[in-house]
Regions:
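Conserved class I S-adenosyl-L-methionine
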Residues: 1-36, 48-52, 71, 132-161, ...
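Class I SAM-dependent methyltransferase SAM/SAH-binding core
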Residues: 38-42, 46-90
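A short SAM/SAH-binding and catalytic strip from SAM-dependent methyltransferases
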Residues: 100-114
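A short glycine-rich, Lys/Arg-flanked "PGG" loop and its adjoining helix->strand segment in the class I
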Residues: 117-129
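Short alpha-helix
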Residues: 160-176
Length: 249
């Protein structure tokens, strides 16, 4: 698991920067009702996506929440007065506070399945009837684009995806949310190169391959034999799911 306090300084540049943030914000906003008045961005990170939502929808009262102090500090510098330090598993808001709740690239980071379930439960709890929850799903799978890099890494150990689409849908249903749509967007600038993937392996980005593990070095050696070491392979394509809390009465 990465330390997001340390990651904060270089987070934007290492995650596709502004092009990816723009694509994410545009797609998420396309699933937020036009009459929404209050939106919560859970796990907002450095607010690269959040600030684009604010700029595109000045009618929305937008709040961002993140647990990592480093991330929240950077987010608050971009959106003063709109960022709170909060655990997504215990959101500090009353039931039914928001017309829309989003979580972009958050669920896959949860330590275990119970934590992911708690995040979805909290997002559902603070959503008003008729509101929409929008979240990314299947993030790890999005990076498998059928490239030679993916072929080398095919045998790597993997943990069960906390954000598997079917799992997230089941969590949502358990808390009264119904499917309300699906969309996708490209992870612009995030196509992997062999040399960059080797660096990511050695930094611990692949959860079950820790720095210094002999298996990590075997995969790194396989990547080092690939041609065009600095040529990015195709960009990933991220999937977004929307869920709504039905109106009652």
């Amino acid at each position: 698991m990465l330390d997001y306090e340390k990651e904060a300084a270089g987070y934007d540049a290492s995650r596709g920067g502004e092009p990816r943030a723009r694509a994410a914000a545009d797609t998420v906003l396309g699933m937020v009702p036009a009459d929404a008045a209050r939106l919560l961005d859970v796990g907002c990170g450095t607010a690269t996506v959040t600030r684009r939502i604010v700029a595109a929808r000045p009618d929305l009262q937008v709040i961002g929440a993140d647990l990592a102090h480093g991330m929240a500090r950077r987010a608050a510098a971009r959106l003063p007065g709109r960022i709170v330090l909060a655990d997504a598993r215990r959101l500090p808001f009353p039931d039914g506070t928001f017309d829309a709740v989003i979580s972009v690239w958050l669920l896959h980071l949860m330590p275990d399945a119970t934590d992911a379930r708690r995040v979805v439960a909290e997002c559902a709890r603070v959503l008003r009837p008729g509101g929409v929850y929008v979240t990314t799903v299947d993030k790890a799978a999005a990076h498998d684009v059928g490239s030679d890099i993916d072929a080398v890494l095919a045998a790597r150990p993997r943990r069960p995806a906390r954000d598997a689409a079917e799992t997230v849908a089941a969590h949502a249903a358990e808390h009264g949310l119904r499917p309300a749509g699906q969309a996708a967007f490209p992870g612009l600038g995030q196509g992997r190169s062999p040399r960059g993937t080797i660096a990511d392996l050695r930094r611990g980005w692949f959860t079950l391959l820790t720095p210094g593990d002999p298996r990590t070095e075997r995969f790194a050696a396989g990547l080092a034999r690939l041609p065009d070491q600095d040529r990015p392979r195709p960009d990933p394509r991220f999937t977004v799911r929307a869920f709504t809390r039905p109106r009652t009465g």
